[in-house]
């Protein structure tokens, strides 16, 4: 009736996502997955920012989102230590914080949603030890230094390799980007680097490496290549024999949006949520859908 408020109207909320970068296809897919899932909740307005791979800019964006009055912050921190202070401050203001994929130091957040990077890295190492017969030179394509997935994908891999003196590892930083990987690999190959296998901490970097190999007249299928994420490009490469295996690495966008809705509704949520990862080979590539 006129003048009488709707006592049953849902409370409206503003959720902000401070993303590290949208130049990376996996990170863009993560934001879009969150956006699509929030469409199920008409009382939630969703906004996001592009940190352009700049830690200081991501910090600034978090501050701007808080100033805009977000009811919940979602963030995938570019660097663990550098983002800890600002994220903890937001959490201490009683603004819920959902971390997607990447963590921080301490427990200044509401929930952390991610696959198990340590387990993935150990499985990748064990696979390469088997195919290389415990000896050889591995090129390790490293993601963003300082990000928790990079730290875990590096440390757990090298821990498995450490007891094997006939294994050597050369790391190069590709920042999870094709272009950065191509530049770094071209530079190494110009210096005469030879290697027996590639451990790529993302399938985007594996794709960049394959482009360089082909340019040099090297068949990617002649070298064991391990990737992580299992994007459509990796699925096709595995089918074609140009990549050995990959591990699915879901973005957690859907789970993040649903957890955010639960938090805003006053529900208790776990401090940590581990997402499943599947090892994909030529045998099951047709049965496992790529993450995007």
Predicted segment positions?
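Short, solvent-exposed amphipathic alpha-helices that sit
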Residues: 26-40, 44, 120-124, 148-167, ...
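Hydrophobic alpha-helical
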Residues: 72-91, 156-157, 170, 174-236
